[in-house]
Amino acid sequence: HLISNGLDNLLIEPDDVYEYLGEKTLLVIVDTHRQSFLETPELFDKVDRIVVIDHHRKGAHFINNPIFQYHEPQSSSASELVTELIFYQTSKVNVSEQVANFLLSGICLDTKFFKSGVSGKTFEMAMNLKNYQASVEAVNEYFKEEYEEMKLISGIVNSAKVLSPGIFMATSDEEDIITRTALSKAAEEILSTKGVQAVFVVGRTNN
């Protein structure tokens, strides 16, 4: 979505990041608190100043001694936590409309468009993002599937098999490379089926 919206300058290839590292480098880890879950785990050992923002329940092998940690398992998403940090600053933080929409899309993805895992704070943060012109209509555009992605998701959904009553597993074809977003969409589609309590979706990603 960043690339398609002209914000590819916000992205950097993992192999290129090391030339920007210095004594004052701050590494902000979002949506996980485990080093093994990082996209580039080897970067972790190159930086001394680390911030962790996550909403998942704390598991084993969590990151020790960050200089700042906001870990709130009762929040709907990491996007909700980031939004909360933005809006509770003593001085106003400028947020562009596109960034506000990206944050809202994170909330929508993790809550299945406010159908599960929401709280009063979730709605409050979504309303705050609307002050920066974020909208569910824009988020829907982000989530529109391209044809090839739609085929991959459909294949995963059709592969679902019962492990035990209410518990399912679905897999992608071995040769397919699947984005994490596509895996999440497939899981959500299966979970929306009556009688499904949990689903495990397995696929090969770029990493």
Predicted regions and their residues:
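Structural signal for conserved beta-strand scaffold positions within catalytic alpha/beta enzyme cores
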Residues: 12, 29, 52, 69-72, ...
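Active-site cofactor/cluster-binding pocket
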Residues: 6-66
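Short alpha-helices
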Residues: 55-126
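A generic local secondary-structure boundary/capping motif
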Residues: 15-18, 38-42, 69-72, 92-93, ...
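Low-complexity, flexible helical/coil segments
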Residues: 24-27, 48-50, 62-69, 84-92, ...
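Short, low-complexity, polar/charged sequence segments that are solvent-exposed and flexible
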Residues: 7-9, 30-31, 46-49, 70-73, ...
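Hydrophobic helix-and-loop "lid/oligomerization" segment in the mid-to-C-terminal part
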Residues: 1-7, 18-25, 104, 108, ...
